[in-house]
């Protein structure tokens, strides 16, 4: 494709699509791409913006993607830069990042489901960024679509005027041309000073096998060309421009310059994305801007888990694989750790459980690793008796009980929208998870919005699955971190044959310790193979044993070769066996099979 000529700023529109998961966001993006002929019919596939196999299989967007579209309206040529964003709560940092570079957003709502929790959260991010919001009701061709009710829902819940809302069906390609016209007439053109020194915001970066680290930028002021020397303001380092490109899901389109207001890809020939961090500012090395762009928040890990290779000699392979994934995922961080039970591995920080699942699946699939993950935990604020504070993300790091003054755990504010028929089940689940009700609001006769504060620890295990199961999959959920609060927490250890299995230790609410301990030891009794000696499985809090099960020893018939004759001979052999078992019990170690850990992590 030939390099394209610069477009005047008044003819540029930068917009993103925000929606709850499954509301047809990626399908709508495909429609807009097809209508603008950005990709030929031969190359067009469904979910073309979702480039990872795992995205296509799960039907979700994980990585925000951008595409440059050309569209002609009333004889005038326009450039539309579309940024597709993820819909799942774990990837909301991708949403906030993408919205920094836009002037408008399409708020896509399913005509059969109405406004969901994640829709509200993403809309507030867009409003905070002063974006023009264009409501779009999708799936209007479905027999159970209720457009009037959904319009009212958007007005009541979010407060956006829906008198001239766009009604579309991405699948049936209804209303797409009208939507493109509305994007051009409603979303404002970018503002910026084309004559000022270059100021470009890096809002995404990734690693390319041929070009090295690439930065996706929005030109706020000035322009950039291939002859320039660029200063990365965060690192203070200068680099020459190797190439400039317009984004496209299938192939990058080369250009000689990126003008003010445009979105494009910059190649500086760097080896690592850490040299062009997301949120950093690029400027002209010879004529730099006075200060960088501010206010961009980097992503912080929310959930931590140990990840270990099942084949212990593949520790270095796991390190290499994590480093490669980190090149494209600035929210992923890790550090080495070791476990007596599992050997050497890494403590990895994730944005949430789906992020953890996706990373683990990519490590196993793309790097052929067999992995085991420990129970996910959050970061606890531990106040010690000497007035110091320690932050603990691994239960094995928790100091002894007599050194602890108090423990504070992180809380989140959860917003849940549910059909009212499931309200009783849902409130029971939230109470079991130590939730505190803050607000309950009926959106209409059949839907309720609940606001609860919940301990983060309670939502990182199985909350999402239980929420879906108690509401038959109809509830939607979103959360934001709020603060650390004091809690009555203890460390629950599991001992096998007297030894603590460190990989199974968890930090838990004191009132739930007995119930969890009992469930763990009962499950382990079924899972651990019988030994030649008796094995005690115990759950303990501090030095106090709160639950115990015993695996009986396997009997070996030592008198099998004695035929008749003197009973004292048999007795002597049985006594000798008893002595041997006593000695084995004292020094014997129980090897726990890997499937024991896998099964135990699934225990409620």
Swiss-Prot record:
Subcellular location: Cell inner membrane
Reactions the enzyme catalyzes: GTP + H2O = GDP + phosphate + H(+)
Primary localization: membrane
InterPro entries: EF-4 (IPR006297), EFG_III/V (IPR035647), EFG_V-like (IPR000640), EFTu-like_2 (IPR004161), G_TR_CS (IPR031157), LepA_C_sf (IPR038363), LepA_CTD (IPR013842), LepA_IV (IPR035654)
Membrane topology: Peripheral membrane protein
Gene Ontology BP annotations: positive regulation of translation
Protein name: Elongation factor 4
Organism of derivation: Helicobacter acinonychis (strain Sheeba)
